[in-house]
């Protein structure tokens, strides 16, 4: 993937990264409340960020079109917890979003070779 990006052989895409300043303290990345708030924030921003505004040919039938997104996690355990919370909130908010999970064993470092 990193070679394809460098060679410009992939479709153009946008990404948003959020970094937290490291103050030396340990963050419980699997904290249930933390995951809940991050998922809530992500879903609130998703439709605008992806220009994936729901369209309807009638009120009961949303037209499925738009863009996909990738939400990366630090571990398999984190991916599972985020997946469950996304499914729960998508259902509660009745959003026209589908979610899937892919767990890869290879660590990808942007603009460098695969490690």
From Swiss-Prot:
The middle section of a putative type I restriction enzyme that if reconstituted might recognize 5'-GAN(7)TAY-3' and cleave a random distance away. Subunit R is required for both nuclease and ATPase activities, but not for modification. InterPro entries: HsdR_RecA-like_helicase_dom_2, P-loop_NTPase. This is Putative type I restriction enzyme MpnIIP endonuclease subunit middle part. It comes from Mycoplasma pneumoniae (strain ATCC 29342 / M129 / Subtype 1) (Mycoplasmoides pneumoniae). It holds the Pfam family T1R_D3-like. The lineage of its organism: Bacteria, Bacillati, Mycoplasmatota, Mycoplasmoidales, Mycoplasmoidaceae. It comes from the Bacteria.
